[in-house]
Amino acid sequence: MLKIRLARGGAKKRPYYSIVIADSHSPRDGRFIEKVGSYNPLLKKDDPNRIVVKQERIQEWLGKGAQPTDRVARELSKLGITQWTAGNNPKKGEPGQKAKERAEERAQREADRAAAAAEAAAAPAEEAPAEEAPAEEAAAEAAPEAAAAEEAPAAEAAAEEAAPAAEEAAPAEGEEQA
């Protein structure tokens, strides 16, 4: 099968392409049948020398069955030689089979967690009103005792911390005076 395609030339970072007619199995920059134009992507898009083609030869090769590559077809359509339409592949962005299965499993786990959380929230809410009255009374009685018990150790700890600090500060002051 014959292709109308680009063959790269030029130096590193300075591409220059020849538009050639070549067998589809030959290498990109390898043997070709005929050179039918040139393409210089470094020139501005409105520059007439950006793409130079032999229109009669391209028409002849298209008539013989040569297929242009996408890039060449796009450039030829700008010149009015061929019609180019953008390809549309709606399945390209779809996730694969494994990704779909993982998403379903994740959704199922989240639904199970939400259901369990709803059950857990509903069950204690029903039981809690019956138990709250005695619990509040017991908590009210225990609270003053607990508060007094917490305050005593806290006061002792504060006193212990203050005493060593005072002892360390006293000799330091004495040394400064001497």
Curated annotation (Swiss-Prot):
Compositionally biased spans, kind Basic and acidic residues: 91-113
Record keyword Ribonucleoprotein present: yes
Biased composition (Acidic residues): 128-139
Annotated segments matching region Disordered: 78-178
KW Ribosomal protein (keyword) present: yes
MF-aspect GO terms: structural constituent of ribosome
GO biological process: translation
Residues making up the signal peptide according to the UniProt record: none
Gene3D superfamilies in UniProt: 3.30.1320.10
PROSITE patterns hit by this protein: RIBOSOMAL_S16
Bias kind Low complexity: ranges: 114-127, 140-172
GO CC annotation, single: cytoplasm
Alphabetized Pfam families for the sequence: Ribosomal_S16 (PF00886)
Protein keywords: Ribonucleoprotein, Ribosomal protein
InterPro entries registered for this protein in UniProt: Ribosomal_bS16, Ribosomal_bS16_CS, Ribosomal_bS16_dom_sf
NCBIfam families for this protein: S16
Family from the record: Belongs to the bacterial ribosomal protein bS16 family.
Protein name, entry field: Small ribosomal subunit protein bS16
UniProt organism field: Phenylobacterium zucineum (strain HLK1)
